[in-house]
Design a protein with these regions (language model features):
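Catalytic PLP-binding core of fold-type I/II PLP enzymes
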Residues: 23-82, 89-92, 123-124
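Active-site C-terminal subdomain of aminotransferase-like
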Residues: 14-21, 69-196
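Non-catalytic, mobile gating and regulatory segments of ester bond hydrolases
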Residues: 1-15, 28-29, 36-47, 54, ...
């Protein structure tokens, strides 16, 4: 693409697939992006977006004490959680991240989040009040500037916020650890049944 003189707007890394929880290596992707941008003398840096809509909660294990294992996860679970944490270590390198609370965040649908490292990137999706005056009729609070959609209720977002506050880091660790433990139990039973 670059050799043809075309631009690359964005590179999307997957942080947790729905089937096998595959995690792309963000450190390698960002390193490759930077190397190619320098090599081709690009006057810009392509955006690196982390599609972490499923994998984001596993970031709660970033500072988990795996050697001590205070939540007493079984060995196979602990190994899986440690592997996921290791694979996600470059999440902070992404220029933007997509998060869904209705997947592994235990929130209702219609509660997603788009985070940008550089706040000026939000201007790329903002609306000009002069072009859309019906969104900006009253007061100085102007949510229509930054939202992609403006006619939805806020209940799902408040429910997601309530989950974050109620569960906290430890609550998500317990829930995710239980998911992984149950997957490991099922895997062990299947392995035993297949190879018995």
């Amino acid at each position: 693409i670059l050799e043809r003189g075309e631009s690359i707007a964005c590179v999307i890394a997957t942080i947790g697939t729905t089937d096998a929880f595959g995690i792309d290596n963000l450190e390698a992707i960002v390193s490759l992006r930077d190397r190619l941008a320098n090599e081709y003398g690009l006057p810009y840096r392509p955006q690196v977006h982390a599609d972490a809509v499923i994998g984001w909660p596993w970031a709660v294990f970033d500072d988990y004490d795996f050697p001590v294992n205070p939540l007493d996860f079984p060995p196979r679970t602990l190994r899986s959680l440690a592997d996921a944490r290791l694979a996600m270590r470059g999440l902070h390198l992404a220029d933007s991240i997509g998060i869904d609370f209705h997947k592994t965040g235990y929130g209702p649908i219609a509660s997603s989040l788009f985070l940008c490292k550089d706040h000026t990137d939000l201007k790329l999706i903002s609306r000009d009040p002069a072009l859309m005056p019906y969104l900006f009729q009253f007061g100085s609070h102007r949510p229509g500037v930054y939202t992609l959609e403006t006619s939805r209720a806020g209940a799902a977002v408040l429910a997601a916020l309530a989950n974050l506050k109620l569960l906290g880091k430890e609550g998500y660790r317990v829930l995710l650890g239980h998911i992984v433990t149950m997957a490991e139990v099922l895997r062990a039973k299947l392995e035993k049944a297949i190879y018995a």
